[in-house]
Amino acid sequence: METKFGVHSEVGQLRKVMVCAPGRAHQRLTPSNCDALLFDDVLWVDNAKRDHFDFMTKMRDRGVEVVEMHNLLAETVAVPEGKKWILDNQVVPNQIGLGLVDEVRSYLEGLSNRDLAETLIGGLSTHEFPESIGGEQLELIRDAAGVNEYLLPPLPNTLYTRDTTCWIYGGVTQNPLYWPARHEETILTTSIYKFHPDFAGKVNVWWGDPTKDWGLATLEGGDVMPIGKGNVLIGMSERTSRQAISQLAATLFEKGAAERVIVAAMPKLRAAMHLDTVFTFADRDCVLLYPDIVNGIEAFSYRPDGKGGVELHKDKGTFVETVRDALGLKKMRVVETGGNAYMRERTQWDSGANLVCASPGVVYAYDRNTYTNTLLRKEGIEVITIIGAELGRGRGGGHCMTCPIIRDAVDY
């Protein structure tokens, strides 16, 4: 299928991107539940909203079309088939519990499109659900489970739109995510691509289906980078497994979407949960990396074996050398997150290596990582800062908070 959508590099002109603003889901974060919801602290939500709006504005100032997930989802559930598909997959006994499925579905179907979208992302607690509908069973659940019991869970990690789906050249993957706290997210993004008027019938799906059980095969977009010349980088990390990588590689080769998948074997650490937390591009021939992790990465490559399968070989040289050679570059400029060991670790924790490019040599970065941002500027990179005090509490920066939908290729 010919499609206008596609991401053909990490640094080409960014044309269209999906983000998800902070909202009701983040108001659900408490000191007692934030750990389970994969945040390290509660957010000052009003400030997070302000800072995210500023980020969107700065992207629009550079000519990027920014679409926001709450809005897309409200427009998706306005399509009757889209609403039905979401509710068929969300309002099920395994999520709601027997005895309340029909009641919850009836309640959700009665909401406005905007309220339904807000509820699907923000969650529905047992204490919000009307007693007149829930009856005695709801009362028993409230008494037994307390205020943190949800009929639909809040999804605060939708803030990090990079992970649930990722565009690889001319198509997209619908990713089975690692942590249970995020499993429902892919249902929502998939519904947008299936039913939203801007996307329906216009999207190539390479791999993944959120209605299936993928077992140990987990994939998150923060580990996936289509860097150009038919190459795809994938981090084998805390959250992306070899089982998923091998399946995706085989599918990309079968569909002619890629020629090589370079696997970065990483330690399984929260501080380095994805490849993009330790390694991102700043220009066509410049990368920013956290040396304490990246210098230890082993690189392997999948290629087609010519018989419909794949072959796997260990790459010679360092990870950066492997990337440089794959792009046909004579030299790769490397900027390391700066300072002594203490400063480097703090910078890493504050998503200092998590850049996203607006165009070659123009990046968005958190303001707090001043030392590293200065190093980038000395290398000739234009750094546009965004405020990270609240947005970074789930351990993600500009790269994590953006799902590019259209990005130009780069001439290597």
UniProtKB/Swiss-Prot annotation:
Annotated localization: Cytoplasm
Molecular-function annotations in GO: arginine deiminase activity
Reactions mediated catalytically: L-arginine + H2O = L-citrulline + NH4(+)
Pathway(s) this gene product operates in, as recorded in its UniProt entry: Amino-acid degradation; L-arginine degradation via ADI pathway; carbamoyl phosphate from L-arginine: step 1/2
Keyword Hydrolase: yes
Keywords: Arginine metabolism, Cytoplasm, Hydrolase
GO biological process, one term: arginine catabolic process to ornithine
Main EC class the enzyme belongs to: hydrolase
Family: Belongs to the arginine deiminase family.
Name the record gives this protein: Arginine deiminase
Organism in which the protein naturally occurs: Mesorhizobium japonicum (strain LMG 29417 / CECT 9101 / MAFF 303099) (Mesorhizobium loti (strain MAFF 303099))
Gene name of this polypeptide: arcA
